[in-house]
Design a protein with these regions (language model features):
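Sec-dependent N-terminal signal peptides
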Residues: 2-8
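Short cysteine clusters
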Residues: 167
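Conserved "landmark" site that anchors the functional core of diverse proteins
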Residues: 171
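Cell wall/extracellular polymer interaction/catalysis modules
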Residues: 8-164, 175-187, 191-192
Length: 192
């Protein structure tokens, strides 16, 4: 059975497409295709408050353009909503390290609850973002190895009512439908 599932993934790629009408737009359209057929969307998405850029840098307010893998773990504050990927329920002390000087830049980190992490910068206390990060998937932008300053913490997450700092956001109901459908090997293409 596993061999059949693997063959399906290889023969029938799952692709997420985020298309902004222009490089400066803060909204986009998200669709999901499998075997070249649209299976989800079109949905309204939000991108960075400065649009989409192939030259994204840490803190510049753009969403990076290009094609990226989706991380193997979905994170969230609530119980697993039924995703196919591995799920990690966020708890106090779960951070995304966004400090370009840190050795663990652009990675998930857990520190003791209440402890001050050794990394600083714009690092995110994931468990505190109760609207945006009820569920999130990591966009594998600038990972393995991460280049300091090139950008970090690019996620698919719930819409908060405005443009993002560089992530892609969707209305929460659409996000949960997408996260449940995601399978290993999915790719995300962002462009204008």
């Amino acid at each position: 059975m596993l061999t059949v599932a693997l063959a399906l993934v290889l023969a029938c790629p799952q692709r997420i497409h985020v298309t902004a009408p222009s490089a400066r737009a803060t909204t986009a359209t998200l669709t999901v295709t499998e075997c070249g057929r649209r299976v989800l969307g079109p949905w309204r998405a939000r991108v960075g408050y400065r649009g989409v850029s192939a030259h994204h840098r840490e803190g510049d307010g753009t969403t990076p353009a290009g094609t990226f893998a989706i991380g193997p773990v979905v994170y969230g504050l609530d119980a697993d909503p039924g995703v196919r990927l591995r799920y990690h329920r966020l708890r106090c002390g779960d951070w995304w390290d966004e400090d370009p000087r840190s050795r663990s830049y652009n990675r998930f980190r857990h520190v003791a609850c209440g402890a001050t992490p050794s990394f600083r910068g714009g690092s995110e206390a994931l468990w505190r973002a109760t609207v945006a990060y009820r569920e999130l998937a990591v966009v594998e932008y600038n990972t393995a190895p991460a280049v300091p300053g090139r950008g970090s913490g690019i996620f698919l997450h719930a819409d908060t009512g405005h443009a993002t700092n560089g992530c892609v956001s969707l209305p929460r109901n659409d996000l949960v439908v997408l996260l449940r459908r995601l399978r290993p090997g999915a790719s995300l293409t962002i462009g204008a």
